[in-house]
From Swiss-Prot:
Full protein name: Arginine repressor
InterPro entries on file: Arg_repress (IPR001669), Arg_repress_C (IPR020899), Arg_repress_C_sf (IPR036251), Arg_repress_DNA-bd (IPR020900), WH-like_DNA-bd_sf (IPR036388), WH_DNA-bd_sf (IPR036390)
Matching SUPFAM superfamilies: C-terminal domain of arginine repressor, Winged helix' DNA-binding domain
GO cellular component: a single term: cytoplasm
HAMAP family membership: Arg_repressor
Keyword Transcription: yes
Record GO biological process: L-arginine biosynthetic process; protein complex oligomerization; regulation of arginine biosynthetic process
The organism of origin for this protein: Shewanella pealeana (strain ATCC 700345 / ANG-SQ1)
């Protein structure tokens, strides 16, 4: 086992491990980090690191649920413009769907709810990275769609 490793080494190794997209549990990450010489690592610290770096659980190529750091994710900071968190805006005849960076949907939905009916939004439902927008009227869904797109400077 190696002598004490620096916090920078831990972060670098942690990110490298997550890029492998093969660890489905925090205990597996703990074991991998311990095998790399970080003897003082535990599940609690791994949990905090996963949160700090914006890790998400997703399916890998083998359809296994694993932790990863998606490239497009850039963890939002206090100075991040909200428009950077909106990845896609689409619609059908009755609903508008907004896809966001993981973890940003509820924040964006709250903003959309606050502008509400005057802008054609009856309400929203948000998950982790997807928002369903119910327009005030399906007859004006195109106008509501344009309002949402302009709010986030989104262009097709």
């Amino acid at each position: 086992m190696q002598a004490s490793r620096s916090p920078d080494d831990l972060v670098k190794t942690f990110k490298s491990i997550l890029k492998e997209e093969r660890f489905g549990s925090q205990s597996e990450i703990v074991n991998a980090l311990q095998a790399e010489g970080f003897s003082n690592i535990n599940q609690s610290k791994v949990s905090r690191m996963l949160s700090k770096f914006g890790a998400v659980r997703t399916r890998n190529a083998k359809q296994e649920m694993v932790y990863c750091l998606p490239a497009e994710l850039g963890v939002p900071t206090a100075g991040s413009p909200l428009k950077n968190l909106v990845l896609d805006v689409d619609h059908n005849q009755s609903m508008i769907v907004v896809r966001t960076s993981p973890g940003a949907a509820q924040l964006i939905a709250r903003l959309l709810d606050s502008i509400g009916k005057p802008e054609g939004i009856l309400g929203t439902i948000a998950g982790d990275d997807t928002i369903f927008i119910c327009p005030s009227s399906i007859h004006s869904i195109e106008d509501t769609l344009e309002t949402v797109k302009s709010l986030f400077n989104y262009a097709d």
